[in-house]
């Protein structure tokens, strides 16, 4: 089921207490309730997190987005939501290699929270979004694979995070360790 939020300027349409009530009622029927928070840290954000038990912070590898994510993490940790997790969106491996985009490890070090997924900047996302179709329909597309892996981690599976453009496995990790 999907319940989209109203696109109004008035973020007081639902207050924090009402959001808690709503999520508590939904918890009786559903195992997972995903709430997409509005950008920024205004009242809409505070209302959205009022009923949350867990938070996934989604950011891009841009300095301004990472600063915003850091502020969000601070707010989440000062509320009742502990141990927020991180998804890094729109990573471009070629830009990371050239030093034009921050590396995933640097972002994780800066934000100091657990990484549960990295989504590559993939043209497939644009085409699927424009068609109104889910990206995960194509499990072979890099973005589709990334979302499937994130879902598995949310459900508790312990699988390695795939970082686009990076070799995976034990020896690759060992090589990276000695490079530092």
Which residues does each PLM region occupy?
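Phenylalanine-focused residue identity feature
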Residues: 1, 30, 45, 124, ...
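P-loop/Walker-type NTP enzyme "switch/lid" segment
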Residues: 1-28, 127-136
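Short, solvent-exposed coil/turn elements at secondary-structure transition points
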Residues: 6-8, 90, 121-122, 141
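Conserved active-site and cofactor/substrate-binding residues in soluble primary-metabolism enzymes
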Residues: 14, 67, 102, 138, ...
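Conserved catalytic-core segment of NTP-binding enzymes
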Residues: 17, 21, 25-28, 32-121, ...
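NTP-binding/hydrolysis catalytic cores, primarily Walker-type P-loop NTPases
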Residues: 131-180
């Amino acid at each position: 089921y999907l319940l989209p939020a109203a696109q109004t300027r008035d973020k007081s349409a639902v207050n924090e207490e009402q959001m808690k009530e709503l999520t508590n009622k939904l918890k009786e029927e559903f195992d997972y309730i995903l709430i997409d928070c509005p950008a920024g840290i205004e009242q809409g954000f505070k209302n959205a997190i009022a009923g949350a038990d867990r938070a996934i912070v989604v950011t891009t590898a841009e300095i301004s987005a990472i600063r915003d994510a850091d502020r969000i993490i601070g707010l989440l940790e000062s509320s009742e939501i502990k141990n927020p997790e991180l998804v890094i969106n729109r990573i471009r491996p070629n830009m990371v290699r050239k030093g034009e985009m921050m590396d995933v490890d640097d972002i994780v070090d800066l934000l100091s929270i657990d990484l549960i997924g990295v989504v590559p900047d993939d043209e497939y996302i644009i085409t699927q979004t424009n068609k109104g179709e889910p990206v995960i329909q194509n499990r072979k597309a890099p973005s589709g694979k990334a979302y499937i892996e994130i879902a598995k981690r949310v459900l508790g599976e312990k699988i390695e995070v795939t970082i686009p453009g990076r070799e995976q496995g034990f020896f690759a990790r060992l090589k990276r360790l000695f490079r530092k």
